[in-house]
């Protein structure tokens, strides 16, 4: 179902099925962005007198349980509605048999429209020889602007997402990149979202 919401899955750090594997390599309490549909919401008081919310987040690869309590509860709880597409800013803790997901903030799909944009371009690793890099750089230089740029490099090794912090492009770079055969799209800026 989340595939019906353009940009939602692409903004996430990983799929839900990939999270346990990714978490093995992350420092404790690392922040990630998770996309999915909200299911099975339960709100209840904590022993300390506050409130907590427990919910299931699901995507095309699987589902996991997340919790929100303390200060995060006030921001998260109103956005937890069954069958709602969301992006969850979460701290991930490794634990026996998997991961614990602590929701810090939730953005509904509609709220993501208000987040500043970034441009992401996908590049096949085999095309990143000197000539390919020069071609990509030339396209980007022609369309300088204010949008942050991310390059998703794909190859036999898997994929890597590179944030090119020194490069800013204009929205018109999207059309130029697509015309040159690159897959490019505008997304909510992950860095803005990860800072909460």
Describe every region a protein language model picked out:
Residues 1-196:
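Primarily single-stranded nucleic-acid-binding OB-fold modules
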């Amino acid at each position: 179902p989340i595939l019906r919401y353009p940009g939602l899955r692409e903004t996430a750090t990983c799929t839900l099925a990939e999270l346990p594997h990714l978490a093995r390599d992350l420092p404790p309490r690392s922040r990630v962005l998770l996309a999915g549909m909200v299911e099975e919401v339960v709100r209840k008081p904590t022993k300390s007198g506050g409130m907590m919310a427990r919910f299931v987040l699901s995507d095309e690869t699987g589902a996991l349980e997340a919790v929100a309590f303390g200060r995060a509860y006030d921001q998260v709880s109103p956005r937890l509605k069954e069958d709602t597409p969301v992006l969850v800013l979460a701290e991930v803790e490794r634990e026996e048999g998997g991961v614990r997901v602590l929701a810090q903030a939730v953005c509904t799909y509609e709220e993501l429209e208000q987040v500043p944009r970034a441009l992401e371009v996908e590049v096949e690793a085999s095309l990143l020889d000197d000539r390919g890099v020069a071609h990509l750089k030339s396209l980007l230089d022609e369309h300088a602007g204010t949008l942050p740029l991310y390059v998703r490099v794909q190859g036999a090794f898997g994929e890597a997402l590179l944030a090119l912090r020194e490069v800013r492009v204009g929205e018109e770079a999207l059309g130029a990149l697509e015309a040159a055969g690159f897959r490019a799209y505008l997304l909510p800026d992950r860095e803005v979202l990860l800072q909460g």
